[in-house]
Swiss-Prot record:
Pathway: Amino-acid biosynthesis; L-arginine biosynthesis; carbamoyl phosphate from bicarbonate: step 1/1; Pyrimidine metabolism; UMP biosynthesis via de novo pathway; (S)-dihydroorotate from bicarbonate: step 1/3
Any one Pfam family match given in the protein's UniProt record, by short name: CPSase_L_D3
InterPro entries assigned to the protein according to its UniProt record, in alphabetical order: ATP-grasp, ATP_grasp_subdomain_1, CarbamoylP_synth_lsu, CarbamoylP_synth_lsu_oligo, CarbamoylP_synth_lsu_oligo_sf, CbamoylP_synth_lsu-like_ATP-bd, CbamoylP_synth_lsu_CPSase_dom, MGS-like_dom
Chain sites annotated for binding Mg(2+) 3: 820, 832
NCBIfam families: CPSaseII_lrg, PRK05294.1, PRK12815.1
UniProt name for this protein: Carbamoyl phosphate synthase pyrimidine-specific large chain
Annotated keywords: Amino-acid biosynthesis, Arginine biosynthesis, ATP-binding, Ligase, Magnesium, Manganese, Metal-binding, Nucleotide-binding, Pyrimidine biosynthesis, Repeat
Occurrences of domain ATP-grasp (ranges): 133-327, 671-861
Binding residues annotated for Mn(2+) 3, in chain numbering: 820, 832
Length: 1062
C-alpha cells in the first residue's frame, strides 16, 4: 500500500499536563509520531498545552502550538492551519476525547479533516460501556456479568442473581469516586447509596466481581490490510482488583500455559480486528487461575501507558509504527528499526524478564488513603530487566528511589501479625515488602496465596529471595553464595548488611574474584538476528555484548521515575544534554530506568543502559565505558545525590565542582558565601535538637519556615506561626533525617521571583526572570509563574541581575543555576540556590528561545559563553506574556488536603501565552482544567488573618455580577463594607450548610484560606475536599483568586450605573 499521497498536512494532538493516570508516556509517543511523520515528508502541526515536553520543541514539528486542549482553541488552530488529517490516538485519553468533541461539534466535517489511524466509531465502541458489551456478546467474548442500576432495590435484584462479591462503578464520576468492592449486605447498602449520591445522573454499573483472577494484558498492532500481531503480553503480579497502573507487572507473562497464552492471544487479535483499529491497542483480560474461563476487562483503542512499557520491554517502537500505519503503511512494509533487517510484522521474542513497579506519591501525602483499588494513584513507574524474575524484581525495587533496596522495609517489619495480614489482604503500596516480611516470619506459600491470591509461582520467587538472605547471613564470605546472590539481583549494600561488613569490601571481594556484570542487548528477537541497537541491561553471566568504542564518551545520569517534585522537566533537560553531547563530537551514554520517557528511547543516545541509578550499578558502567566524565546536573536530586559517592570512587563530575555544589546546598557554607558577597537572606539558623529549635525561633521571631536540609520539592517543609506548632513539627520532622539538622528561617512575606542562569565560571547569561503570582511560602513548583515580570521595577531587575551574576561567580558555577528570591519591602533576599537544572528550564527555553540545556552542556564540556554567542547579561525580554500554571491530581487522591504551601503538590504544568497577562492567564487556567464560568456565586470562607484582604476581592467579584456567599464571620465584615452577601451555615450548624451548597452546585468558585492547625478533620479541609470531589474550583491562595479575577474582569463587561448629574 505504501504511504498516502493524498494528505499533506497532519495535526497531532498531545496529551496535555501530567496527571496521575497520564504521565510522560505520551510525550514519548507524541515525539515518536512527529518524527515518524516528518521522516515521511508530511507537514506536521502539533498542539499540546504542556511546555515540559520534548514534543513541543519547535524542531519536532513544522509548527508547534502550546495552547489549551479545548474545543475552542483546537478548532481555532484547525481553521487557521486547515490540516488534511488529524492523529488523536497518541494523546492519551485527552487526545481521544478531543477527537470525539471535534467530531460532535461538526468541526471535522466542516473543514474536511480526516481522522487518521483508528476511526471514530471504533473509538466509541471501545470507550462506551454499553456499545462495548454489545460487541463482545456478538463476538462471543465473555465480559463480567453486569447491569446498570438507578436504585438500591435494583442492586439487590442483581446480587440475588449473581451473588457476592460485586464491584460498584458510579457513572460519570472521576476515577471511580463513591464506588468499590462489595462483600456483603452491609457494604452493599453503604457503597450503592454513596455511589448513587456521587453520580450526577444517579446511575451505577454493578458487575460480578472477578477480583482474585489473574490480570493479563496484550499489546497488539493492526494495519489497514488486517495484518495483526501481538507485540508483547504482560502479567500483573497483583490479581484483578488493583488498577493495572498501580500493579507490579512482568513481561512476558510468567504463569500462563501455552494453551492459555494462545487462547488469550487469539481473543485479543479477534477483538482488534472486530473493532477495526489501525495502530496500537491494549486488551486487558481477567483469567480464572483454576479453569480456562476468562473475561475481557477493557480495551484501550490507543497508545497507552502499557504500550510505552511494551515498547521499552521489547524494543519495538509501537507509537512510531502506529503513526506510519495511520498514513497507510502495512506492517510488512515497515522495517523494525532495532534489527534493521526484520520487518514490523515479526512478533518480538524476549530472552529476559522485565519488571515494572509503580512509584506512588504517598511520601508527599502522609494523610492520603494508601490502599490500592480500581482507581490509579501512582505518578510514575520504574522498569528493570534481568535474566530471571528475582534479578529483574530486585533491580526494579532499588530503582524506585524510595529508600528501599530489597524486599525489606523497616516500617513493615515492625508490624504486628494482624496489621501485617491486613496489608496482605487489602493491597497498598507496601504489599511487596509485607510479603517479604511474612515469609521471614514463616508463613507458607499456601497461607500467602490464600491471603493475597497472588500466583504461587511469584510467591515462590519471593521466598527464594528470603531463603537466600538466610543462607547469606549464616555463611559470611561464601563465594558460591555471593555469586548466586548477584545472579538473583542482590545489591552489594544488602549483602554487606547481611555480612556485617561495608559495601566497599563486598565490591572489592567481587573484583578480586572477577565477579562483575556483563551487559546484554535488547534486540526484539532473542538474539536470533544480528542487531544494530545500543540498548543494554546488566546481568551476571559470561558473555558481554556491549563493546567500548574508540570515541571519547560522556555519561549522563537520568532522573528516574516521575514523582511529585521531580517531573518530566528533568527528562526534557536530560534529552537536550544528550543531543548537545553528540553535537560536541562525543559519544553520549545514558543511564536511566523510567520506561515512559523520551530519554530511554533507544534512538535518543548513542548507548542506553536501562539500569537502577545507584552507585553500584552506575560504577559498573563507568568501569566498562571509561567515560571522560559524568554529568549529574540534569537528573534532578536523584543524580545530585549520587555525585559525591561517585567522586569518592574517582569519577570525574563534569560542570560545577562538587565542593561548590556543596557550598550551595550546605546551610553554613552557603551563609558564609552570601556574607562574603554581601547578599541579604532571611535570618535563620540550624537546629539539631528540639530545645535549640525553640530558642532559635524565639530569637528570630515567628512566623518561621522550618525544613530539613537537602530536599527536593520542599518535602516536610512548613510555615509555623507559634511555639506549639513548632514543637509538633519537630516531633514529626526531625525524624526525617537525624544526621541532617533542621533549618529554621524567618518567613518573609512578599513576591517570589525566580531566575535561571547559565554560567561558565566567569561569564553569566540570564535567559529570564519569572515573577510568581502566589506570595512566598507557596512552593515555586505550585505557583503560577509569569514571564516577563509584570510588576517588577527596572531598578529591582538590575539588582536581581547583579546578584545572580555575583552568586554564579561566587559559587563558581559551571552549567545551570536556579535562584529563588523574595522581594520584601524594597530589597530582594535570597531564599535558595539550586546548582543544577530546575523545573523551569523547559518553560523558559521555550518562551525565550534560548536552548538552555544545550548551551549549559557545551559550557560544561569546555566552551565559554562568548564562544557560543552569549555575553554576560540579561536576555532581551519577549513581547508576549507567558504563564506557567501548575496542574494537580487531587481528584485521584482522596483525603489529601489541597491547600498550597511550601511542600510541593502539583504533578504537572501547562503554559498560556498571549499579548496580555489576562489573556495568557485565561489560557493557562483553562488549559490546567479549570472551568471559568462568567457568572454565578462565589463562596468565601476566610481565615481571620486574611479577612481584610478578602474584602476588595469580594467587592470586585460583586462588581462583575457574581453573588457573594459567606459564612457568618466573613459575611459580617463584607456587610459592613456595603457588599450584598448571603450568609451560609457553617458545617456545625443545621442543614443546609456549606457542604450542601457545594454539593448542590450553588457555588461556582470557593475561596478558602487555611486556618492554622493541620489535622484534616477541620472544617476547612472538608470544604476543600468537597469542592474537589464535586468539581468546583477551590482556591486556597488569595493571590490565585486575584489572578482569576483579573481574567474574569477582562472577559466580562462591568455594569456600572451612570453618574448622577450635578
Amino acid at each position: 500500500m505504501g504511504k498516502r499521497e493524498d494528505i499533506k498536512k497532519i495535526l497531532v494532538i498531545g496529551s496535555g499536563p501530567i496527571v496521575i493516570g497520564q504521565a510522560a508516556e505520551f510525550d514519548y509517543a507524541g515525539t515518536q509520531a512527529c518524527q515518524a511523520l516528518k521522516e515521511e515528508g508530511y507537514e506536521v502541526i502539533l498542539v499540546n498545552s504542556n511546555p515540559a515536553t520534548i514534543m513541543t520543541d519547535t524542531t519536532m514539528a513544522d509548527r508547534v502550538y502550546i495552547e489549551p486542549l479545548t474545543l475552542e482553541f483546537v478548532s481555532r488552530i484547525i481553521r487557521m492551519e486547515r490540516p488534511d488529517g488529524i492523529l488523536p490516538t497518541l494523546g492519551g485519553q485527552t487526545g481521544l476525547n478531543m477527537a470525539v468533541e471535534l467530531d460532535q461539534a461538526g468541526i471535522l466535517k466542516e473543514y474536511n479533516v480526516e481522522l487518521l489511524g483508528t476511526k471514530l466509531d471504533s473509538i466509541q465502541q471501545a470507550e462506551d460501556r454499553d456499545l462495548f458489551r454489545a460487541l463482545m456478546k456478538e463476538l462471543n467474548e465473555p465480559v463480567p456479568d453486569s447491569e446498570i442500576i438507578h436504585t438500591l432495590e435494583e442492586a439487590y435484584t442483581f446480587v440475588e442473581r449473581v451473588g457476592y462479591p460485586i464491584i460498584v462503578r458510579p457513572a460519570y464520576t472521576l476515577g471511580g469516586t463513591g464506588g468499590g468492592l462489595v462483600y456483603n449486605e452491609e457494604d452493599l447498602v453503604e457503597i450503592v447509596t454513596s455511589g448513587l449520591k456521587y453520580s450526577p445522573v444517579t446511575q451505577c454499573l454493578v458487575e460480578k466481581s472477578i477480583a482474585g483472577f489473574k490480570e493479563i494484558e496484550y499489546e497488539v498492532m493492526r494495519d489497514g490490510k488486517d495484518h495483526a500481531i501481538v507485540v508483547c503480553n504482560m502479567e500483573n503480579i497483583d490479581p484483578v482488583g488493583v488498577h493495572t497502573g498501580d500493579s507490579i507487572v512482568v513481561a512476558p507473562s510468567q504463569t500462563l500455559s501455552d494453551r492459555e497464552y494462545q487462547m488469550l492471544r487469539n481473543s485479543s487479535l479477534k477483538i482488534i480486528r472486530a473493532l477495526g483499529i489501525e495502530g496500537g491497542c491494549n486488551v486487558q483480560f481477567a483469567l480464572d487461575p483454576d479453569s480456562f474461563q476468562y473475561y475481557i476487562i477493557e480495551v484501550n483503542p490507543r497508545v497507552s501507558r502499557s504500550s510505552a512499557l511494551a515498547s521499552k520491554a521489547t524494543g519495538y517502537p509501537i507509537a512510531k509504527i502506529a503513526a506510519k500505519i495511520a498514513v497507510g503503511y502495512t506492517l510488512d512494509e515497515l522495517l523494525n528499526p532495532i534489527t534493521q533487517t526484520t520487518y514490523a510484522s515479526f512478533e518480538p521474542a524476549l530472552d529476559y524478564v522485565v519488571s515494572k513497579i509503580p512509584r506512588w506519591p504517598f511520601d508527599k501525602f502522609e494523610a492520603a488513603n494508601r490502599s490500592l483499588g480500581t482507581q490509579m494513584k501512582a505518578t510514575g513507574e520504574v522498569m528493570a530487566i534481568g535474566r530471571n524474575l528475582e534479578e529483574s524484581l530486585l533491580k526494579a525495587v532499588r530503582s524506585l528511589e524510595a529508600g528501599v533496596y530489597h524486599l525489606d522495609q523497616p516500617d513493615v517489619n515492625d508490624l504486628d501479625k494482624e496489621s501485617l495480614e491486613k496489608k496482605l489482604t487489602k493491597p497498598d503500596d507496601e504489599r511487596l515488602f509485607a510479603l517479604g516480611e511474612a515469609i521471614r516470619r514463616g508463613y507458607t506459600i499456601e497461607e500467602l496465596w490464600a491471603l493475597t491470591k497472588i500466583d504461587r509461582f511469584f510467591l515462590r520467587s519471593f521466598a527464594r529471595i528470603i531463603q537466600l538472605e538466610t543462607q547469606l547471613k549464616e555463611n559470611v564470605g561464601d563465594l558460591e553464595l555471593l555469586k548466586e546472590a548477584k545472579e538473583r539481583g542482590f545489591s552489594d549494600m544488602i549483602i554487606a548488611d547481611l555480612w556485617g561488613t561495608s559495601e566497599q569490601e563486598v565490591y572489592e571481594l567481587r573484583m578480586n574474584h572477577g565477579l562483575s556484570p556483563v551487559y546484554k542487548m535488547v534486540d526484539t528477537c532473542a538474539a536470533e538476528f544480528a542487531s544494530a541497537t545500543p540498548y543494554f541491561y546488566g546481568t551476571y553471566e559470561e558473555e558481554n555484548e556491549s563493546e567500548r568504542t574508540d570515541k571519547k564518551s560522556i555519561l549522563v545520569l537520568g532522573s528516574g521515575p516521575i514523582r511529585i517534585g521531580q517531573g518530566i522537566e528533568f527528562d526534557y533537560a536530560t534529552v537536550h544534554t544528550v543531543w548537545a553531547i553528540k553535537e560536541a563530537g562525543y559519544e553520549a551514554i545514558i543511564v536511566n530506568n523510567n520506561p515512559e520517557t523520551v530519554s530511554t528511547d533507544f534512538s535518543t543516545s548513542d548507548k542506553l543502559y536501562f539500569e537502577p541509578l545507584t552507585v553500584e550499578d552506575v560504577m559498573h558502567i563507568v568501569n566498562l565505558e571509561q567515560p571522560e566524565g559524568v554529568i549529574v546536573q540534569f537528573g534532578g536530586q536523584t543524580a545530585i545525590n549520587l555525585a559525591s559517592e561517585l567522586a569518592a570512587r574517582g569519577v570525574k563530575i563534569i560542570g560545577t565542582a562538587l565542593e561548590d555544589m556543596d557550598r550551595a546546598e550546605d546551610r553554613d557554607k552557603f551563609e558564609q558565601t552570601l556574607v562574603e558577597l554581601n547578599i541579604p537572606q532571611p535570618l535563620g539558623d540550624t537546629a539539631t535538637s528540639i530545645e535549640e529549635a525553640r530558642q532559635i525561633a524565639e530569637r528570630i521571631g515567628y512566623p518561621v519556615l522550618v525544613r530539613p536540609s537537602y530536599v527536593l520539592g520542599g518535602r516536610a517543609m512548613e510555615i509555623v506561626y507559634k511555639e506549639e506548632e513548632l514543637l509538633n513539627y519537630m516531633a514529626h520532622a526531625v525524624k526525617v533525617n537525624p544526621k541532617h539538622p533542621v533549618l529554621i528561617d524567618r518567613y518573609l512575606t512578599g513576591k517570589e521571583l525566580e531566575v535561571d542562569a547559565i554560567s561558565d565560571g566567569e561569564n553569566v547569561y540570564i535567559p529570564g526572570i519569572m515573577e510568581h503570582i502566589e506570595r512566598a511560602g507557596v512552593h515555586s513548583g505550585d505557583s503560577i509563574a509569569v514571564y516577563p515580570p509584570q510588576t517588577v521595577p527596572e531598578s529591582l531587575k538590575q539588582k536581581l541581575i547583579e546578584r545572580t551574576i555575583e552568586l554564579a561567580r561566587g559559587l563558581r558555577i559551571v552549567g545551570l543555576l536556579n535562584i529563588q528570591f523574595v522581594w520584601h519591602k524594597d530589597d530582594v533576599y535570597v531564599l535558595e540556590v539550586n546548582p543544577r537544572s530546575s523545573r523551569t528550564v523547559p518553560f523558559l527555553s521555550k518562551v525565550t528561545g534560548v536552548p538552555m540545556a544545550n548551551v549549559a552542556t557545551k559550557v560544561m564540556l569546555g566552551k565559554t559563553l562568548p564562544q557560543l554567542g552569549y555575553e554576560t547579561g540579561y536576555h532581551p525580554e519577549a513581547k508576549e506574556v507567558s504563564v506557567k500554571v501548575p496542574v494537580f491530581s487531587f481528584a485521584k487522591l482522596r483525603r489529601v488536603d489541597i491547600t498550597l504551601g511550601p511542600e510541593m503538590k502539583s504533578t504537572g504544568e501547562v503554559m498560556g501565552r498571549d499579548k496580555t497577562l489576562e489573556k495568557a492567564l485565561y489560557k493557562g487556567l483553562i488549559a490546567s482544567g479549570m472551568s471559568i464560568p462568567t457568572h454565578g456565586s462565589v463562596l468565601f470562607t476566610i481565615a481571620d488573618k486574611d479577612k481584610q484582604e478578602a474584602i476588595s476581592l469580594a467587592k470586585r467579584f460583586y462588581q462583575i455580577g457574581f453573588s457573594i456567599l459567606a459564612t457568618e464571620g466573613t459575611a459580617h465584615i463584607l456587610h459592613e463594607e456595603g457588599i450584598p452577601v448571603t450568609t451560609v451555615n457553617k458545617i456545625s450548624d443545621e442543614k443546609p450548610h456549606l457542604l450542601d451548597v457545594i454539593r448542590a452546585g450553588d457555588a461556582q468558585f470557593v475561596i478558602n484560606t487555611l486556618t492554622r492547625g493541620k489535622q484534616p478533620a477541620r472544617d476547612g479541609f472538608r470544604i476543600r475536599r468537597e469542592s474537589v470531589e464535586n468539581g468546583v474550583v477551590c482556591l486556597t491562595s488569595l493571590d490565585t483568586a486575584e489572578a482569576l479575577l483579573r481574567v474574569l474582569e477582562s472577559i466580562t463587561f462591568s455594569a456600572e450605573s451612570m453618574p448622577v448629574m450635578q
